């Protein structure tokens, strides 16, 4: 999987003048825990901003990385999509929530769950571009076609400026024939849109949240941290052209 908390950390470390905001819109809260945030102690989260119209500024928490802030997830996000059904312009709520922050940060990274529910649709409607993670596993390519179809619909009806930032291969193990086959197939289909960076399987990244510190500060020399550093650099390079 891709860890946006790490990508954001690496962006700020690589370029000290960059300001990055991570929005954790996944109920599993991996981005929040990856940046040392205990969501049980959070008083204002992305949930309050979406459902209760809380000011986004009240939900922003500073992290231990200079220039990197986060709006954390909350367990109540699990039921948020049902609560959103009765709201006006429900697909555009997150876009409205994030609007005041667009000029405050160089990058806003929105972490979503893999499911194509209303929260993910909100994120795609609010975004300028989308990174598509491709797990090097059996049904990966099937999932891509569904997501691409959703992006096409959102682009035509909700967000005409939405672009594909790139396809990112994750959970890669070069020893597995299947992983290499998926890599070849994705590269053949999407060519220049595929990131040069590949995120390899890595255990160290999973250990950091249990220590309550950002993953990049837990083990900067791990393979996973180095992969995410390369990805951050690639994103910065692509966006500076």
Regions found by a protein language model. Give the residues of each.
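P-loop NTP-binding core
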Residues: 3, 9-241
């Amino acid at each position: 999987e891709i860890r946006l908390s790490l990508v954001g950390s690496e962006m700020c470390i690589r370029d000290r003048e960059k300001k990055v905001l991570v929005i954790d819109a996944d109920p599993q809260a991996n981005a929040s825990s990856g940046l040392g945030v205990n969501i049980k102690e959070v008083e204002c989260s992305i949930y309050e901003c979406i459902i209760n119209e809380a000011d986004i500024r009240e939900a922003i928490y500073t992290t231990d990385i200079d220039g990197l802030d986060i709006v954390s997830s909350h367990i109540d996000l699990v039921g948020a999509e049902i609560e959103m059904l009765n709201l006006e312009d429900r697909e555009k709520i997150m876009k409205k929530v994030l609007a005041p922050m667009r000029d405050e940060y160089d990058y806003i990274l929105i972490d979503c769950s893999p499911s194509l529910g209303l929260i993910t649709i909100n994120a795609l409607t609010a975004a300028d571009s989308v990174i598509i993670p491709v797990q090097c596993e059996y049904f990966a390519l099937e999932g891509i076609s569904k997501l691409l179809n959703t992006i096409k619909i959102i682009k035509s009806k909700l967000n005409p400026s939405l672009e594909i930032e790139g396809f990112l291969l994750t959970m890669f193990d070069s020893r597995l024939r299947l992983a290499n086959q998926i890599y070849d197939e994705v590269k053949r289909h999407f060519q220049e849109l595929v990131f040069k960076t590949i995120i390899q399987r890595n255990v160290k990244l999973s250990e950091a949240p249990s220590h309550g510190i950002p993953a990049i500060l837990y083990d900067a020399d791990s393979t996973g941290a180095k992969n995410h550093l390369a990805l951050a650099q690639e994103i910065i390079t692509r966006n500076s052209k």
